[in-house]
A protein has these predicted regions:
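Acidic, Ser/Thr- and proline-rich intrinsically disordered linker/docking segments
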Residues: 1-63
């Protein structure tokens, strides 16, 4: 199953921009609330993705 989220780009020349992404929930290793600020960090095989949605919203989408 895929879920659609809003990625917050955190590095490079486009840092701070947002874009819509689709993630296969089978590929998610873990997710945790961002320590400073809003959003959630999602860990996938190729690295981490920071999204605008809260930890609770992601938990509901995956369940």
């Amino acid at each position: 199953m895929f879920i659609e989220l809003t990625e917050v780009i955190t590095a490079g020349i486009t840092a701070g921009h947002k874009r819509q992404i689709s993630i296969n929930t089978n590929r998610i290793i873990s997710f945790a609330p961002v320590e400073s600020g809003e959003g959630t960090t999602i860990e996938v095989k190729r690295g981490n993705i920071r999204v605008k949605e809260t930890y609770e919203e992601i938990k509901e989408l995956i369940a």
